[in-house]
Amino acid sequence: MRHVTGELAASHAAPLFYQSWRPEDEPRAVLILIHGFGEHGGRYNYLVDYLVPRGVAVYALDLYGHGCSPGKRGGLSEWEQYVQDADALVNLVKREEPNLPRFIMGHSMGGLIVASYLLDHQAGLNGAVLSAPLLEEANVSPLIKTAMKLLNRVTPGLSLSTSLDAGAISREPAEVLRYQQDSLNHDKASVRLGNEMLRMAPEVHRRAGKIVLPLLIYHGEGDQLVPISGSRRLADEVGSTDCTFVAYPGGYHELHNDLDRATVLADLYEWLERHL
């Protein structure tokens, strides 16, 4: 396996950190990966170790304010910056792997980013994968939403702790500990980022009929961080005639780091194979 790191010119003045993993032989396809909130592109080692030896190259960036990329942790000016950053990574892959089938995948907040990206950018992609996409907020009261909107007008850059429950990412204690000990992870979100997430999920549902490319959506039924109902709803709303929705019984939020990851990764690879 060949591992490369680099800098990606995107929507910000400072470049973003990205990395790629390629098989020793020529790959048969490439997966473009957008990570979730508070984490980074280097946390997908099980996925990389499964797909790359089977001929699927993986490219991942660290979003602005995340991982090894610059920016205030959890900071964001507007959602379109995430969309532009995803597009920058897609365009990099088009330049570096011009003849390979291309798939884009997003997990959690990254799933929301990819879903919003697909509303206007599907050309040149063979399909998309959404892993536990953040398409419905968990127990956010109307009072909190109103307070967030008011704060967004006054102090959009204010960072707040999300108090993310690391124990909800996986049923494996070792994976929870690994998450907690990873210094590149954080639980900070700016008021603007929180508002943008609350704004974009309904927008994706409203315009979901525009998503017509092959789509795989999967979610754990035991996910305590992102409700599975948003994924079920999107699967019914998209315009694609080739949409697969899979619910994994008991699965926690990070299915690629959970107890049944071997099954999840095998299912992912099989879906990619069918769409080459």
Model-derived regions: residue spans:
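N-terminal cap/lid segment of alpha/beta-hydrolase-fold proteins
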Residues: M1-D25
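Alpha/beta-hydrolase fold nucleophile elbow
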Residues: E97-H107
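Short alpha-helix in the alpha/beta-hydrolase fold that links the catalytic acid
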Residues: L213, P227-D236
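Short beta-strand/loop motif that positions the catalytic acidic residue
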Residues: I211, I217-H219, D223
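Catalytic nucleophile-loop/oxyanion-hole region of alpha/beta-hydrolase
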Residues: G38-H40, G67-E97, V264
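Catalytic active-site module of serine/aspartate enzymes centered on a nucleophile-bearing elbow/loop
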Residues: T244-L276
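Short beta-strand element of the alpha/beta-hydrolase
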Residues: R28-G36
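Conserved alpha/beta-hydrolase
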Residues: V48-K72
